[in-house]
Design a protein with these regions (language model features):
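C-terminal motif of bacterial Sec signal peptides marking the signal peptidase cleavage site
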Residues: 26-28
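Bacterial N-terminal signal peptides that target proteins for export
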Residues: 4-16
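A long-range scaffold signal marking pre-active-site subdomains of enzyme folds
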Residues: 58, 66-71
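Short, aromatic- and glycine-rich surface loops/edge beta-strands on solvent-exposed regions
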Residues: 304, 359-367
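Primarily the internal scaffold of c-type cytochrome electron-transfer domains
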Residues: 32-52, 71-94, 108-111, 115-333, ...
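Short Pro-Gly-centered flexible turn/kink motifs
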Residues: 341-350
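Extracellular Ig-like/FN3 beta-sandwich strand-entry sites
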Residues: 275, 345, 357-361
């Protein structure tokens, strides 16, 4: 009897031990840490301060490179981190950490470093405090060091013997390929989260890819002194002109409009039996990518309106839209897309059958939008956050006899 008890106890002990080991193994598998694999999952590694400099903050670069710094301050790059829309987005529970890697690209700018993903889940990053975090540099978003500092060197395109810091000439690094690392972020992260910035692919598929690059249009050249007291040399503008929609009310960013507008010229008089037709043609004449491009929430509106000139009553109105339409939940999918390809033209028309003799005014307006007003309200972006600008207006008055 005693022997049977001993055997039973041994079996129970063995079963418990095996169960415990298996349980620990399963628990370990359930919390495995997977390494980061894609380049957009990680920040640019920490960059030390090059010899001769006090920091790699843009504000300190601007002490010498004053004109370039003032241009950069007007750019969207300078607002990449502080932009109210972006700040609203990253506060969402559905927003993964990796979005910040294009808005504050250097490890120096990130308060926490991500070393892996728990169970491969982007919503469970393994973080550790960054001992070299620079809070002031974080506020600068995409600054000078993003493109011009690597491994203790200032990266440039020309040899200079006057710089107080080491310079490494690397035109390939400072090519459009650097732009595309962020301006072609295109991935299905989760079923309801799609990153779809395809400007780089649009440029490659367009008519200018073999002869012009991002830099051709967005960093035009001029001869100037790189810093006060130095001789003039070939330089690039650093305000990176784009949509022209300001990030704050009162600001005036440098715009680069890719569209040409060709409105009809109407005769001054018509008979009361005539139907009056007005058209305006929009052509993507200047962009090497589609318009709009970048954020899929951007769009153009074309509003054509006939008014009674005597009392401003609206007699006819048509609204057209150029842009993508997406459904974001429960699965993100593109519903439609009528963005203008490079060199593509599209004509929009409105007709009026005059109700009586009199004077009538045709009003045409084209506006460029960052997002809908509904989206802005959802993100609490009202008041000081402009959501659109007007890029064309025109009026013509006709008399009907």
């Amino acid at each position: 009897m005693q022997g049977q008890k001993t055997i039973i106890l041994k079996r129970i002990t063995r079963w418990f031990t095996v169960t415990l080991v298996l349980g620990l193994a399963l628990a370990s598998c359930g919390n495995r840490i997977e390494p980061l694999e894609d380049n957009w999952e990680s920040a640019v590694p920490f960059q030390p301060i090059p010899q001769g400099l006090v920091s790699i903050r843009s504000a300190d670069c601007g002490v010498c490179h004053q004109e370039i710094y003032q241009e950069w301050l007007k750019s969207t790059h300078a607002h990449a981190w502080t932009d109210l829309q972006f700040q609203s987005e990253i506060k969402k529970e559905s927003s993964p950490y990796l979005c910040i890697n294009c808005h504050i690209p250097l490890e120096n700018q990130q308060e926490y470093l991500v070393t892996g993903l728990k169970n491969g889940d982007i919503y469970q990053p393994v973080k550790e405090k960054n001992p070299q975090f620079d809070a002031a540099m974080q506020q600068e978003g995409i600054g000078c060091a993003t493109c011009h500092v690597r491994d203790g060197n200032i990266i440039g395109t020309q040899v200079t013997n006057n710089a107080p810091h080491p310079v490494r000439v690397d035109s390939s690094f400072l090519s459009e390929q650097l732009c595309i690392t962020c301006h072609n972020a295109n991935a299905v992260v989760t079923p309801e989260l799609v990153c779809t910035f395809q400007t780089g692919e649009e440029w490659k598929a367009g008519p200018y890819a073999q002869k012009q690059t991002c830099i051709t249009c967005h960093m035009d050249t001029l001869e100037r002194a790189w810093m006060a007291g130095m001789p003039e040399r070939l330089s690039h503008r650093h305000w990176f002109p784009g949509s022209g929609i300001p990030k704050r009310k009162g600001e005036q960013p440098v715009a680069l409009e890719g569209l040409n507008f060709t409105p009809d010229t109407l005769p001054s008089t018509y008979s009361d039996a005539d139907s009056i037709r007005y058209s305006i043609t929009l052509t993507n004449a200047h962009a090497g990518h589609r318009l709009p491009t970048g954020d899929p929430e951007r769009y153009y509106l074309i509003d054509l309106t006939w008014l009674n000139a005597a009392n401003s009553d609206t007699l006819s109105h048509r609204r057209f839209r150029i842009g993508e339409v997406w459904e974001w939940y429960p699965v993100a999918k593109k519903i439609s897309d009528n963005n203008l390809n490079p060199l593509e033209s599209r004509t929009f028309s409105i007709a009026l059958l005059p109700p009586a003799e009199g004077t009538y005014t045709l009003h045409a307006e084209v506006t460029k939008h960052r997002m809908t007003e509904e989206t802005a309200a959802y993100h609490h972006l009202t008041g000081d956050y402009p959501t659109y600008i007007t890029v064309f207006t025109g009026e013509q008055t006709v008399t009907v006899k």
